[in-house]
């Protein structure tokens, strides 16, 4: 396992834990996606081609359509985890709308390729058209009334529908009558022209307004342009947007996906200068973002909404929209396909035919209260890659491992520091792992949604090979310090302040939320086979603290415990697992 305990009266220097990286595998079962007739000529690592992506999309969508038996049935799935919504009847309509809008992220690209697609005996195009019409039909159980208050989840889902309606316009929008279009437009514009939140939410106003403007409807152009400029103002450089206030996958699966999609669908015609800026910002991510993934192409468990999983690769294919610089599409597609299979090939990914609320399986600490079961289909944005034609370089390039082939040499460690955000990405060629150090400065007391102060953000680092473990009440803490506070409770660090990155050393200070006299000066030094920590802890009275390692799997070896007394009053207890090579 992972812990050291320390008692100290004034100050202590904690130096060192070096971790060896372990690997494991999961046997395939019936409940998993299988790559049929893999093409190892074009894709020597995953076997995945564009046709396999289509099959993967159909596999994912089939589970949702198992709940659909008539055109009037709604995309409403069994609730999983008590903390998720709906918690009352009033929240059910928007949960159903989420299921509709987010499964359409998968369905729209499939329909563009195959308008006659049938699932569970239902013509998929007929189903979604029927549901779109019903949104503005007061007699339908799918009816969404016009906006009456402030920003709500309904805005997000209607904005998502606008993306899919444009992506497959000939199938989803054009066949509607003028009366049906006008009625749906009025419903959507009541939200799109309404208030929003100054984060990625502004994109949903943008897509509603841009789509309706594209279709000839009169919209609030000033509000549209204002939201676009505010979104661009959230850019911090090196491919990263700040999502008020965090850095996480929302930079990728929201800003760096929606920005280029908007530019391609609407922006080049409506606001060409703003469109070009979104594309330029997107291109900046090439030098950093792909390095977050492991050598094997796996994504990291990092940040909120991690149940969206492979939505993390959504922006990669969209680099095709910007031709200003060179992109290694063989590496980019290898990452995208590997991350997709990272989940689709695991039997725990689906339950009742629907993706689970978690990372690999149901896991409440990684799920937020704003999510419902249908929320998970945000992952479907990965299939926006299918909007690219078959001859796009993203699909035709031969898979490769990019810089992992020659540039990232074994025996070394490689850090990519991004000064605009203070993010640090570290690559370990010896193990193939990638690691992230990022922002966290949120108190539990002010974190009313209980996610920015939690394990989703507060770890010392996040590693592709070690999905994080939830902290326990008895000091079971992974990749963080725990301090026994004045209430006798174990309290982890979450109030970090970045100091510097120089000479391979990433420095942060931290204080305990409930006792600012407990101070940490942290120094992370990535090494080829792990991390050297040189940390100073200052306390005003005798205090018990512990340092947690990455959470490790217990494979075929037992935990070993050793105790060492270094110098009074300092003592250590170290729990380890014998390491094995990958």
Where would I find each of the regions flagged by the language model?
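Extended polysaccharide-engagement surfaces of secreted carbohydrate-active enzymes
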Residues: 320-572
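Bacterial N-terminal signal peptides that target proteins for export
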Residues: 1-13
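Bacterial N-terminal signal peptides
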Residues: 12-21
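Boundary at the C-terminal end of the N-terminal hydrophobic targeting segment
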Residues: 26-28
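Aromatic-lined, polymer-binding surfaces characteristic
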Residues: 96-99, 104-114, 121-317
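Low-complexity, Ser/Thr/Pro/Gly-enriched N-terminal "stalk/linker" regions
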Residues: 30-98, 123-131
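Hydrophobic alpha-helical scaffolding
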Residues: 89, 93, 248, 268, ...
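Conserved small/polar residues in nucleotide/adenosyl-binding loops
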Residues: 573-579
């Amino acid at each position: 396992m992972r812990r050291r305990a320390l008692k100290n009266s004034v100050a202590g220097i904690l130096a060192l834990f070096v971790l060896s990286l372990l690997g494991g595998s999961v046997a395939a079962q019936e409940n998993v996606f299988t790559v049929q007739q893999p093409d190892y000529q074009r894709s020597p690592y995953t076997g995945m081609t564009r046709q396999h992506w289509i099959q993967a999309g159909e596999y994912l969508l089939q589970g949702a359509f198992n709940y659909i038996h008539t055109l009037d049935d709604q995309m409403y799935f069994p609730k999983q985890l008590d903390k998720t919504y709906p918690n009352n009847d009033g929240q059910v309509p928007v949960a159903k709308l989420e299921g509709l809008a987010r499964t359409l992220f998968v369905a729209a690209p499939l329909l563009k390729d195959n308008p006659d697609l049938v699932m569970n005996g239902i013509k998929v195009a007929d189903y979604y058209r029927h549901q779109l019409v019903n949104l503005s039909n007061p007699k339908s159980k799918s009816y969404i009334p016009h906006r009456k208050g402030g920003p709500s989840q309904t805005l997000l889902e209607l904005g998502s529908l606008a993306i899919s309606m444009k992506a497959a316009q000939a199938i989803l929008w054009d066949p509607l009558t003028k009366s049906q279009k006008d009625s749906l437009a009025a419903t959507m514009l009541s939200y799109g022209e309404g208030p929003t939140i100054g984060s990625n939410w502004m994109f949903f106003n943008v897509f509603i307004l841009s789509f309706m403007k594209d279709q000839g409807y009169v919209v609030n152009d000033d509000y549209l342009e204002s939201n676009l400029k505010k979104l661009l103002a959230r850019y911090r450089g090196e491919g990263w947007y700040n999502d008020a206030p965090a850095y996480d996958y929302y930079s990728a699966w929201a800003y760096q996906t929606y920005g280029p999609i908007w530019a391609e669908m609407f922006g080049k015609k409506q606001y060409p200068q703003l469109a070009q800026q979104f594309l330029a910002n997107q291109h900046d991510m090439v030098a950093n973002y792909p390095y977050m993934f492991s050598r094997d192409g796996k994504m990291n468990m990092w940040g909120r909404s991690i149940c969206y999983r492979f939505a993390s690769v959504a922006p990669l294919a969209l680099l095709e929209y910007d031709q200003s610089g060179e992109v290694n599409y063989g590496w980019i597609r290898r990452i995208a396909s590997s991350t997709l299979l990272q989940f689709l090939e695991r039997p725990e990914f689906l339950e009742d035919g629907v993706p689970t609320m978690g990372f690999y399986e149901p896991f409440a600490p990684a799920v937020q209260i704003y999510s419902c079961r249908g929320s998970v289909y945000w992952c479907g944005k990965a299939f926006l890659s299918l909007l690219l034609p078959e001859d796009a370089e993203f699909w035709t390039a031969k898979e490769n491992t990019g810089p992992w082939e020659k540039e990232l040499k074994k025996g070394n460690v490689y850090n990519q520091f991004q000064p605009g955000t203070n993010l640090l990405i570290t690559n370990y060629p010896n193990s193939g792992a990638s690691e992230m150090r990022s922002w966290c400065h949120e108190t539990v007391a002010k974190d009313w949604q209980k996610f920015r102060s939690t394990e989703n953000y507060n770890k010392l680092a996040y590693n592709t090979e070690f999905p994080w473990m939830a902290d326990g009440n008895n000091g079971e803490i992974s990749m963080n310090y725990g301090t026994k506070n004045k209430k006798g409770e174990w309290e982890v660090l979450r109030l970090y302040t970045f100091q510097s990155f120089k000479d391979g050393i990433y420095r942060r200070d931290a204080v305990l939320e409930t006792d600012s006299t407990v101070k940490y000066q942290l120094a992370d030094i990535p090494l080829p086979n792990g991390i050297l920590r040189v940390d100073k802890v200052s306390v005003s009275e005798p205090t018990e603290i512990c340092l947690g390692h990455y959470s490790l799997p217990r494979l075929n070896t037992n935990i070993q415990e050793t105790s060492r007394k270094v110098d009074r009053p300092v003592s250590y207890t170290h729990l380890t697992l014998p390491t094995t090579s990958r």
